[in-house]
Every structure is written in C-alpha cells, then in structure tokens.
Amino acid sequence: MKKPPVPLLQGGVRADGRAPDQMREVQISVGVISNADGSAMVSYGATTAVAAVYGPREMHPRHLSLPDRGVMRVRYHMAPFSTKDERKSPTPSRREIEISKVLREALEPAVMLEQYPRSRIDVFIEILQADGSTRVASLTAASLALADAGIYMRDLVIGVSVGLVDGTVVLDLNGLEDQYGEGDLPVGYMPNLRRYTLLQLDGAWGRDKLLEALNLAVKGAEFVYQKARDALKNRYMAIAEEIYGR
C-alpha cells in the first residue's frame, strides 16, 4: 500500500482537522432543477452530488413494464471535471455502471413501487466534485429528489461512509482516507424504520470494529437526516408561500 502524502490520523485528529466521529460540513438543497419532477443537491465537504428524478411516467417500450409494480432506473455519472483524473471517454465506466446498480438496490426498499404499476421512475445522479464518499452522498441526494418528486416512500435513505484509518474507525471518508485507509464501509440507512439498505464492506474488519462502525454510521445518518428534513421543510414552505402568498 502506498504511503499517504500526509498522516491520516495523528493524536486522535484527522488530516482535515476532524475528530474520528465527525462528519464534514453537510449542505443540502432540495428543488434545485426546475425542469425535473424532483431534485436535490447534497455536499459532504468537497464532495457534491446532484440528483434529478423524472416520473412516474409510462414505461417505453411497454414490454419492459411490470403489471404489479413500477420500474426504477438509476444512472450515476461523474462529471469530467469532478476529479483531477483525465476522463478519456464520455461513455459510462464499469465503476459507474456498478454504482448505478448498487444505488438502485439501496433505494428500492424505501420506494413504494407497487403504487406505480406499468410505470417507470428515472433517477439521474451527477457528481460535480469528488472527494471521497461519492456513492453515499449520491444516495442521500437521490432519496431527497424522490421525496421532492412526490414519490410514495416508506422512509428516506441516508447514505454515510465509515472506514478504518490507522486502526481507528472514522466517519465520512474524504478522498485521502478513501484512497489510503485500511477499509471502508458505505452504508444506506432508513432512520425511521431503523433498517439498512446498503452495506458494502471492503477491507479486513474484526467483529468489534465492524459493530463500532455500524453504530457510528447510524449516528452519522441521524445527523444527516435532520438536515435532510430541514431541507425538505424549507422546500415545502417555499412552495406554500408561492401558492398561497404566505
């Protein structure tokens, strides 16, 4: 494993000044794309994801529709300018295709697709800037965009990441920690139902460290959930003021 350019953890303080159990600054806006049925922008530190939802609408071609439920399609894409790496092709990479599938599977437990037979719901996610934890920021953004579109949902899905850095469990991996840490665990969590929808373990984790990581992920998800609720509330209040003038 390559040595990181700076110590990732020193004296209980991470390279970016955070404590191990601390999120980066979280910023959430809902209703950011006027021509989408629902949209949201989520930033975890420098990582920024924008999600747009279109639907429900009739499935085309019709033979792909399901008689008892809707079909949700998710596309995750990193903008060419989102990282310092040169992107040689505009076509989706294998990683983007894989993450698109992972995100769809993480969102489906929260979406009442049985309410939309023979219909489709399209979710488009664009990473504007990447500094670690892109898939979990995308998960939160997509969940909020679905809620903004008025899609029937059992709960929001909040995405957070936890990882192992110098043997310490840390919350919300930045790019350096993602690249040089010993392990990472992206988590999708429904705070009201207290259910996980995404657990992707990478690296060597002992039982105690894994339990610590899951507890820390729940703590982080509940923190983000409060900000997500506030963002939705602000969105609905703005709509009500626009309609009713109060």
UniProtKB/Swiss-Prot annotation:
InterPro entries: ExoRNase_PH_dom1, ExoRNase_PH_dom2, ExoRNase_PH_dom2_sf, PNPase/RNase_PH_dom_sf, Ribosomal_Su5_D2-typ_SF, RNase_PH, Rrp41. Keywords: Cytoplasm, Exonuclease, Exosome, Hydrolase, Nuclease. Its main location: cytoplasm. GO terms for biological process: gene expression; rRNA catabolic process. It comes from the Archaea. CDD domains: RNase_PH_archRRP41. SUPFAM superfamilies: Ribonuclease PH domain 2-like, Ribosomal protein S5 domain 2-like. Its EC number is 3.1.13.-. One of its GO terms (molecular function) is RNA binding. GO terms for cellular component: cytoplasmic exosome (RNase complex). It holds the Pfam family RNase_PH. It is found in: Cytoplasm. Catalytic component of the exosome, which is a complex involved in RNA degradation. Has 3'->5' exoribonuclease activity. Can also synthesize heteromeric RNA-tails. Component of the archaeal exosome complex. Forms a hexameric ring-like arrangement composed of 3 Rrp41-Rrp42 heterodimers. The hexameric ring associates with a trimer of Rrp4 and/or Csl4 subunits. Belongs to the RNase PH family. Rrp41 subfamily. This is Exosome complex component Rrp41.
